[in-house]
């Protein structure tokens, strides 16, 4: 499994594809950044749960996807904003409200990876990683 240069875009694509295929979970290589993002998505109810496994000194993550009672994916859209080729930084005042506030933004800040409402409350901006709704 080759790591792409943009592991966040890869994470979002893998979740998107797994949801389309109605899979229960998706396995991928672990990174601290990926786990931070997944933790936020789980906290907001977009993912069911996740596990981190270690085999032969290689860490992988298993992300369990979340579906509604009628088996529709809870996540409608995952959008990568900042990219390695074009970084996007926003001050606290410019953190977007996503999908009538039903979605979330995820930022990398000086205080770690935060969702938009937390960053806004702390009055800190950062790199706008992705939007989820």
Swiss-Prot record:
One Pfam family named in its UniProt record: Ribosomal_S8
GO MF terms, alphabetically ordered: rRNA binding; structural constituent of ribosome
Single GO cellular component term: ribosome
Cross-referenced PROSITE patterns: RIBOSOMAL_S8
Role description: One of the primary rRNA binding proteins, it binds directly to 16S rRNA central domain where it helps coordinate assembly of the platform of the 30S subunit.
Family affiliation: Belongs to the universal ribosomal protein uS8 family.
UniProt protein name: Small ribosomal subunit protein uS8
Organism, as annotated: Chlamydia felis (strain Fe/C-56) (Chlamydophila felis)
